[in-house]
Design a protein with these regions (language model features):
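Amphipathic alpha-helical
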Residues: 12, 192-222, 258, 262-302, ...
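Conserved oxyanion/phosphate-binding beta-strand-loop segments in alpha/beta enzyme cores
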Residues: 1-34, 64-73, 97-104, 208, ...
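Catalytic alpha/beta core of large soluble enzyme barrels
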Residues: 56, 69, 264-361, 367, ...
Length: 821
């Protein structure tokens, strides 16, 4: 048994001192390996982090040993609401809270023996980092990708602050428990919709899990259809409604708006319905968006007291708001055709709204009073004026052309994707670099004045916008006219920080630009990105958008940031995801203290393939610990030469383990190493064989590998040694088959012993002539393994053989006959 504590501390110190994992541009082929950087929470490293980093580090070590110039950095996604909440609850400085957590987390990561280039570390809350968030914002602003418009937000009147969705609990403010209402405020947006088509199209080029690509496709949500204008009654104003079914337009009997639609509050202002509609809105907007649109969710709505005109019939139709309509689809307003849409049908029945049939099956007649459910299939148009008798496919085109001629509609492509609202009424984020001047309007901060730093004279009360408290921050001269003006007091969404951090890693010390084009063009794209499926949409989509926008700003030559993506599975205990509330958390540091980092890493990679969830097992961790101690004991029995069979099996092992690790089948690779280690302990193996075996276990158990590598007399590091190459000419198929045959014969003898109940038999083995030599070579091994008094081997054609029961004739190739007495 080796002292894992001493060994792990020793090699972590040696790695740090020698800086063997430091990376720079060189002539080697590069490989950028990256895990999603963590938020430095107060709870520190959990088992999900540990799995993520163990996967990433094993792969980085493997690629490094293959001669790649590995970029493998780590940093911290350090802005965010938890730090601000801690400041409000405990009067703790968010900066101090965050850096204390970073220090703890970094120490925990170091104990795992991760091979990061720590010289490239970033923390997004440092001015040296968020200065470049602001710089990128200014470039986006110049290009028209950053703009300001009104948007609906959750607002707490009591705290006088905007709330994130997660801060609204059952319709109330998380802090004061007063009711939250929807309010329209001027907000900053990034124009991600400019890239909707490219974001969709380029998914096909990525080596990502199909389910992640499907999630992004659905989020972008491309639809081809018709944009139709519905004029408001007694007004020149109109709604644009997107529909994929213009053929049903004559059957539209009401409109339904999303409760969040900014025009709703305009329409009801000063009307008798205003208070009731506001109550309805506040009730609906706190519901989960996905649940609102679920098929089995009850559909409910409210008439807002206003009407629109059907553009083809000029009929007055009522306007409703309803829970099942979202701003995320189309224009946030739908035309309801209850005869031909089941959801609209149910809603119309519930609120006694007209149902008008405009499509019937060929040769059949439908009537509204006998309609039990919506008719949603194709058919022939009726009740549609000059378009009667057209088939639905033709009618779609003809009605769209007709609307276009009247300037009441046009063919269009719509995306579910919406522009990215980046404004946050928070302190602990990147200040938006904008100044408002009453004479000059919106003025971007000059680049030479970056970074706009967060003020430190803030009291965290949880009320109002924190930055607006600081007079020294807010009051500033206009960069254009020099008169007194006001700074923007919103900060950026923290997803901005993580949308380009992988680019900063390429050039972390650059104080002139976010990164140099040369560095990024060398290291990017990330060859292998590793992180949770929960980031499949927002983070990964925003990072892709940033990369494309920065390309168009000539800051890099790159279309996509991440070539390959691996989404690791959850770690469960007792069949549930680990969480403090469930009392089923296993602390990685406790496991490291008890068994060592190598045991923890190897267990995590052994128990399941990376993309699968796995169940924690105390017995499993103990089993791996025993295996590593046995592996260490292989140092004790090194011979001067290899058995030929060992040479063959070693080269087969190298080939298999290499391919398994390349394909992220770490569990299969570890099992193969275990099997070979168990096999070889009873064979003659030389120093070279053990050396290669040590290098193969190095990605999983790097400390143990370094120690054993050194014990064999090596002065170099195992971590940067060359990966073993399989010599296929040394793989001897026949020899391995023969040995397998001997192994199976031993099992057969043991089974016969049980059946005839002989403890120490005389064993007679009858083989075909060409197998006589291999069995004679293994006689002693068979004798020991089967506890036989003696073992005799005969060729089946040997006339002098001892064969009292006439067993010899039963012998077959690789299947000897056996007799015990």
């Amino acid at each position: 048994m080796y002292d894992f504590k001493k060994v792990e501390e020793k090699w972590q110190n040696k790695w740090n001192k020698s800086r063997i994992f430091k990376t720079d541009i060189n002539k080697k082929k590069k490989f950028y390996n990256l895990e999603m950087f963590p938020y430095p929470s107060g709870s520190g490293l959990h088992m999900g982090h540990t799995r993520n980093y163990s996967i990433g580090d094993a792969y980085a070590r493997f690629k490094r040993m293959h001669g790649y110039n590995i970029l493998y950095p780590m940093g911290y996604d350090a802005f965010g609401l938890p730090a601000e909440n801690a400041a409000i609850k405990s009067n703790v400085d968010p900066k101090k809270w965050t850096f204390n957590n970073i220090e703890i987390m970094k120490e925990q990561q170091s104990k795992l023996g991760l091979s990061y280039d720590w010289d490239r570390e970033v923390a997004t809350c440092l001015p040296e980092y968020y200065r470049w968030n602001q710089y990128i914002f200014l470039q986006f602003y110049k290009k028209g990708l950053a703009y300001r418009k009104e948007a609906m937000v959750n607002y707490c009147n009591s705290c006088k602050t905007v709330l994130a969705n997660e801060q609204v609990v059952n319709g109330a403010c998380w802090r004061c428990h007063n009711k939250v209402e929807l309010k329209s405020l001027e907000q900053w947006f990034f124009k991600i919709t400019d890239y909707a088509e490219e974001l969709l199209k380029y998914l096909d080029k990525l080596s990502w899990p199909e389910r992640v690509k499907v999630m992004q496709r659905n989020w972008i949500g491309k639809s081809e259809g018709t944009l139709v204008k519905f004029q408001l009654e007694n007004s020149k104003d109109y709604f644009e409604v997107f529909t994929t079914r213009p053929d049903t337009l004559y059957g539209a009997t009401f409109l339904v708006m999303a409760p969040e639609h900014p025009k709703v509050l305009e329409l009801i202002k000063g009307t008798k319905n205003e208070n009731d509609v506001k109550k309805f809105i506040n009730k609906v907007v706190i519901e989960d968006k996905f649940l609102r649109t679920a098929e089995d969710k009850e559909k409910y709505g409210m008439f807002i007291g206003k009407y629109a005109l059907n553009p083809l019939t000029n009929e007055k139709i009522p306007i409703y708001i309803a829970n099942f309509v979202l701003m995320d689809y189309g224009t946030g307003v739908i035309m309801a055709v209850p005869a031909h849409d089941q959801r609209d049908f149910e809603f119309a029945k519930k609120y006694k709204l007209p149902i008008k049939i405009v499509i019937t099956p060929k040769g059949k007649k439908l009537t509204s009073d006998k309609l039990k459910q919506a008719y949603v299939n194709e058919g022939v148009l009726i009740n549609s004026n000059k378009f009667n008798n057209l088939l639905t496919g033709e009618a779609k085109n003809e009605i769209t052309k007709h609307l276009s001629g009247l300037k009441l509609g046009k063919k269009t492509i719509q995306y579910k994707l919406r522009d990215w609202l980046i404004s946050r009424q928070r302190y602990w984020g990147t200040p938006i670099p904008v100044i408002y001047c009453q004479y000059c309007g919106i003025q971007p901060v000059l680049e030479k004045d970056l970074p706009v730093k967060l003020p430190e004279d803030i009291k965290f009360t949880g009320q109002g916008n924190p930055l607006s408290q600081s007079k020294s921050f807010v009051n500033v001269k206009c960069p254009k006219c020099g008169k007194m003006a006001k700074r923007e007091t919103d900060t950026m969404d923290t997803f901005v920080d993580s949308s380009w951090y992988f680019l900063r890693y390429c050039d972390p010390d650059n104080n002139k630009l976010p990164f140099s084009k040369k560095m990024v063009n060398y290291f990017m794209p990330v060859n292998q990105y590793i992180g949770g499926i929960e980031h499949a949409i927002l983070h990964l989509l925003y990072a892709r958008f940033f990369t494309k926008a920065l390309r168009d700003l000539k800051m890099l030559n790159l279309d996509e940031p991440f070539h390959k993506l691996l989404t690791q599975g959850m770690v469960l205990k007792n069949g549930e995801v680990m969480s403090k509330s469930k009392g089923n958390v296993v602390d990685p540091l406790e496991i490291i203290e008890r068994y060592g980092a190598d045991t923890l890493r190897t267990f995590i990679l052994f128990i399941a393939s990376p993309e699968k969830q796995f169940e924690w097992s105390d017995e499993g961790i103990e089993g791996i610990n025993k295996f590593l101690n046995k592996f260490y004991s292989l140092l004790e029995n090194v011979s001067k030469k290899n058995d030929l069979i060992v040479e063959s099996k070693l080269n087969r092992l190298i080939k298999k383990v290499t391919q398994d690790i390349e394909d992220f089948r770490f569990n299969n690779a570890i099992i193969s190493i275990m099997e070979f280690s168990e096999y070889v302990k009873n064979k003659n193996y030389n120093k070279d064989t053990l050396e290669k075996l040590i290098l193969m276990i190095s990605p999983f158990s790097p400390h143990l590998a370094e120690e054993m590598h050194e014990k064999l007399g090596n002065k170099s590091f195992a971590s940067i040694s060359e990966w073993p190459k399989a010599n296929e000419s040394k793989i001897n198929e026949n020899l391995e088959k023969e040995e397998e045959s001997v192994s199976n014969t031993i099992k057969d003898i043991l089974n016969i012993k049980k059946l005839v109940n002989i403890e120490n038999p005389k064993t007679y083995i009858y083989v075909i002539p060409k197998e006589l030599e291999i069995y004679n070579q293994n006689k002693d091994g068979i004798k020991i393994s089967t506890s036989s008094k003696d073992v005799k081997v005969y060729a089946v054609n040997d006339k002098l053989k001892h064969d009292p029961k006439n067993k010899a004739h039963k012998a077959k190739p690789n299947k000897p006959a056996i007799y015990l007495e």
